[in-house]
Amino acid sequence: MKTPLTEAVSIADSQGRFLSSTEIQVAFGRFRQAKAGLEAAKALTSKADSLISGAAQAVYNKFPYTTQMQGPNYAADQRGKDKCARDIGYYLRMVTYCLIAGGTGPMDEYLIAGIDEINRTFELSPSWYIEALKYIKANHGLSGDAATEANSYLDYAINALS
């Protein structure tokens, strides 16, 4: 998995040199950023159940047909609601993985690469997940650098689905 730090080390190594002072300063900046990312990941993980539940409800409120239509892709029954929560949880986990990794690598490799095919195959609307991610962004309760870090990956996921 590529991160900004592994990229810098890889480039320097391929050129047979030590990291430059600028690259080292970037690394120190990344470590400061990592602290905020870890704080955000911890907070999102501890609030995951309530964020997922609220995000699912936001989807049902904006798209009421999702709870009225029958079928395996809708939330008309508890099984459908459980699937919806599971899928929202998957997006939230990807955000926390990115926060820990310090880059979009986990989301790029494990989610974005096949999301169009998954949504098409299972007849899932990206707009459902966009709404869920917007809810999480508006309600995660983070502030400062932790919020900035979390919001950047939430926005990345929203843009990938748009």
UniProtKB/Swiss-Prot annotation:
GO cellular component, one term: phycobilisome
One Pfam family hit: Phycobilisome
Gene3D superfamilies (UniProt xref): Phycocyanins
Annotated residues for binding of (2R,3E)-phycocyanobilin: 84
Membrane topology: Peripheral membrane protein
SUPFAM superfamilies for this protein: Globin-like
Recorded superkingdom: Bacteria
Record PTM: Contains one covalently linked phycocyanobilin chromophore.
Gene Ontology terms: biological process: photosynthesis
Compartmental location: Cellular thylakoid membrane
Stored InterPro entries: Globin-like_sf, Phycobilisome_asu/bsu, Phycobilisome_asu/bsu_sf, Phycocyanin_a
Keyword set includes Acyltransferase: no
NCBIfam families, per the entry: phycocy_alpha
Quaternary state and interactors: The alpha and beta subunits exhibit high affinity for one another and form heterodimers. These heterodimers form heterohexamers of 3 alpha and 3 beta subunits which, in turn, aggregate into a heterododecamer consisting of 2 heterohexamers.
Role, per record: Light-harvesting photosynthetic bile pigment-protein from the phycobiliprotein complex (phycobilisome, PBS). Phycocyanin is the major phycobiliprotein in the PBS rod.
Family: Belongs to the phycobiliprotein family.
Name recorded for this polypeptide: C-phycocyanin alpha subunit
